[in-house]
Amino acid sequence: MAKEKFDRSKTHANIGTIGHVDHGKTTLTAAIATVLSKKLGGEARSYDQIDNAPEEKERGITINTSHIEYETEKRHYAHVDCPGHADYVKNMITGAAQMDGGILVVSAADGPMPQTREHILLSRNVGVPALVVFLNKVDMVDDEELLELVEMEVRDLLSEYDFPGDDVPVIAGSALKALEGVEEYEDKIMELMDAVDEYIPTPERDSDKPFMMPVEDVFSITGRGTVATGRVERGQVKVGEEVEIIGLTEEPSKTTVTGVEMFRKLLDYAEAGDNIGALLRGVSREDVQRGQVLAKPGSITPHTKFKAEVYVLSKEEGGRHTPFFTNYRPQFYFRTTDVTGVVNLPEGTEMVMPGDNIEMNVELISPIAIEDGTRFSIREGGRTVGSGVVSVIEK
């Protein structure tokens, strides 16, 4: 039987449940899918189906993640849920599951716990744009004042990490009771999803963002000029438009795209996802190299110093067997190339062990086109030993 057609008329967003262990993330995920399927049609998912998350490999890192899909009246969602805390850390840093927004689950019976804090910090550092809060297990709390106290604590915690704590929607309910079909709690799930629909911004499509293409290879074609090839990461470029060549040199240089070719056919323009060759006017083969990017002028700039949130692979994942210290000098692999950089650990951190995650300062020996949210791998001799995302650009 043919699968039903994917409905493109609804906007699509990627979200995930985050929060402390045993506060009810997976139960809530099951409750959302179940209640929405009951009210609006679609596939219900049981707790067990979600909890037995398959192992995935992303950049050589083993991550257990469950992906489910569901729809509200307004949107189509892909929802990611992870069984273990380490899986969240890896997922968010590698971008294995890009999140346009998150549902922070906090048990009303326990209040915010250490991983609640850590997941909020991670969300901020990896650039999750918005969070909505679900206060779970309210059926276990008799005291109305206690609920208000927990809500205040969560709001303060969000504000501490630069989320708008006063404005974030907080919905109180019970995922378990909703799964059991208790109507007042099913209504709370619908209320939560209304908040997610309204409060989590519609993600900007890659094709609407400013043009950027990482350069993978460079050819010179006799009589025509220099061609840079690569996959357009975002935006679009039209023949005749000006672009900048950015990275690995002190200053970006400007050129004009005089031709766009894909599968040996000439195009008027290329957009996100296309593998193309871009013919560049007045550029010699020496002026452009792998590791640079072509980009809309002024949209991205080259930098050497930044803060990053990093996950260090464990020995079992093929990572290092020993810790590293400040002044560690590995290669940082951005898009298509390795650049050596020097690591500076935060004050009070003596060393970083395999399997840890850490916020560190990095200084590259050559400038690379980066911005907040740019992802990279850390490598030693071609072997991946870490994965990271730029959280703050410093220079």
Swiss-Prot record:
One family name in Pfam for this protein: GTP_EFTU_D2
Enzyme Commission code: 3.6.5.3
Claim: Membrane is one of the keywords in the record: no
Residue span of region G2: 60-64
Gene3D superfamilies the UniProt entry points to: P-loop containing nucleotide triphosphate hydrolases, Translation factors
Catalytic activity: GTP + H2O = GDP + phosphate + H(+)
GO cellular component, one term: cytosol
Binding-site residues, GTP: 19-26, 81-85, 136-139
G3: region residues: 81-84
Cellular localization per UniProt: Cytoplasm
Residue ranges the record marks as coiled coil: none
Annotated region described as G5, given as residue ranges: 174-176
Keywords linked to the UniProt accession: Cytoplasm, Elongation factor, GTP-binding, Hydrolase, Magnesium, Metal-binding, Nucleotide-binding, Protein biosynthesis
UniProt region (G1), positions on chain: 19-26
Chain residues that bind Mg(2+): 26
SUPFAM superfamilies in the record: EF-Tu/eEF-1alpha/eIF2-gamma C-terminal domain, P-loop containing nucleoside triphosphate hydrolases, Translation proteins
Family, as annotated: Belongs to the TRAFAC class translation factor GTPase superfamily. Classic translation factor GTPase family. EF-Tu/EF-1A subfamily.
UniProt function note: GTP hydrolase that promotes the GTP-dependent binding of aminoacyl-tRNA to the A-site of ribosomes during protein biosynthesis.
Oligomeric and partner information: Monomer.
Protein name: Elongation factor Tu
Organism: Macrococcus caseolyticus (strain JCSC5402)
